[in-house]
Amino acid sequence: WYFSNDLPNYRFLETYKPAVSSKIYNNNGDIAADFAVQKRTFVSIDEIPDFVVNAFLSAEDKNFFNHPGIDAKGITRAIFNNLQNIVSGKRLEGASTITQQVAKNFLLTSDVSLSRKVKEAILAFRIEKYLSKKRILELYLNEIYLGERAYGIASASMVYFDKSLKELSISEAALLATLPKAPSTYNPYRNLNTTLKRKDWVLARMLENNFLSKNGYEKEIKKTIVLKKRKLNFYNESLFFT
């Protein structure tokens, strides 16, 4: 009861849409410039390919469609580990489901404390009662920070591959799914080998969760990842429109 007092209002999430970046198009219909401190492009959950969703579920919350906002096993494990961490003075660890991450990203601070984790769990439980799973997933995939100033998977797809979500391969989607855990550590422009190892781990989880067949896994694990950052040109056309 103590922690449930004075919690932020979560009902605005039903209609929330992030502020997206302003884009300038050349007269061929291509993006010539993108103005924003944070790169954002909102994509409806119905427009996100299943294999992209499955990559993130495998990496972040494989039980997303079966839990009520919190993962009891994960919380039990985190509580046990955190009791040891408190004694030893180590950083507290999380057990965040996707819904808990939505609660934290939209409604709470990022400080790591037991009180915030309790509030996060309460809010996650309430959000699950108020919003559909599809809406929660849509919020998460459009708001999650994925490095290089990219927020949301559509922006990250452009930042790392210069592709729309539908153009991604499964292995490329798996690479993007490595980023929420630690965007700086797994930034492929800085730590490619580390990121590729994590990408292979995500593909293995997709196989384990029956999102990939054995043949599909073997095909994707062998694919070479080619990074391609979108380079916007202000001068290649004389006529622009917004």
How would you label these PLM feature ranges?
Residues 14-41, 47:
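Short extracytoplasmic
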Residues 16, 35-36, 68-73, 114-118:
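Short, glycine-/polar-rich solvent-exposed loops and beta-turns at beta-strand/coil boundaries
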Residues 31, 40, 62-64, 82, ...:
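Solvent-exposed loop/turn segments at secondary-structure junctions
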